[in-house]
């Protein structure tokens, strides 16, 4: 019985000593993160889709913050994310990457053909934002409010029952295309 207490005390003291050493080392060798990169990372949609050319949102935020990467490469975030980053960095807004005009790209949404879905859950596993719901061997569906249109769920589907479709314009998603509105200047008569 006495040997058990000695072992318990010895292991407890070793745990306490190693915990103190790890605590000291974590403070001594801590790497400070750039607060601007943290703020940019919070703005990005965290879909980890890779459409920007980086493996995820954090590497893209680091590239913007420290390497001066363009702020207009996040397709799922679109114009709203680009404008927030431009405001944060105090730079001029840029057109969304791939667009030479100032028109925002059409938002895409994954749609599952539920008649052909076999319930394999491969699309659920591939979705970075958990926008697809369903169970094994049951049909799946996409929650349109959460889907970023990143296209990561399309390739894993063995029955090819997922496709991306443009989101229909609603009063919430519709925007004026000011470049297509014809403007005619009418001269004003000056009275003498």
Swiss-Prot record:
Binds 3 [4Fe-4S] clusters. GO terms for cellular component: plasma membrane. Residues 32-91 form the 4Fe-4S domain. [4Fe-4S] cluster 2 binds at residues 117, 120, 123, 157. Residues 108-137, 138-167 form the 4Fe-4S ferredoxin-type domain. Residues 1-26 are annotated as: Hydrophobic. Part of a membrane-bound complex that couples electron transfer with translocation of ions across the membrane. HAMAP family: RsxB_RnfB. This is Ion-translocating oxidoreductase complex subunit B. It comes from Citrobacter koseri (strain ATCC BAA-895 / CDC 4225-83 / SGSC4696).
